[in-house]
Amino acid sequence: EVASDDVAAEEAAAAPKIGRRVRVTAPLRVYHVLKAPDLDIQGMEGVVKQYVCVWKGKRVTANFPFKVEFELAVEGQPKPVRFFAHLREDEFEFVDG
């Protein structure tokens, strides 16, 4: 029961961060965006979509627990390319507005 209380507290602490806009503060490169390989995302803004350290009510080990969605304007593309990156909380800051 104690463990489930800890998990519930962890989920409750993360819940207000979901949906908030963030800016990447750490120098980070991602390689999984097909339209922009070797992309430096430092300074980019995105939205926290999910906290992944709790899954089906159990704690899981996630080194990068915040799933953040980004949009990238790519020349020649009518719509921005959407992609996700998993970040640690010390790699981004919350952006007001």
UniProtKB/Swiss-Prot annotation:
Localization, UniProt: Plastid, Chloroplast
UniProt xrefs under InterPro entries: Elect_transpt_acc-like_dom_sf, Fd_thioredoxin_Rdtase_alpha, FTRV
Single GO biological process annotation from the record: photosynthesis
Keywords: Chloroplast, Oxidoreductase, Plastid
Keyword field contains Chloroplast: yes
Function of the molecule: Variable subunit of the ferredoxin-thioredoxin reductase (FTR), which catalyzes the two-electron reduction of thioredoxins by the electrons provided by reduced ferredoxin.
Protein name: Ferredoxin-thioredoxin reductase, variable chain
Protein species of origin: Zea mays
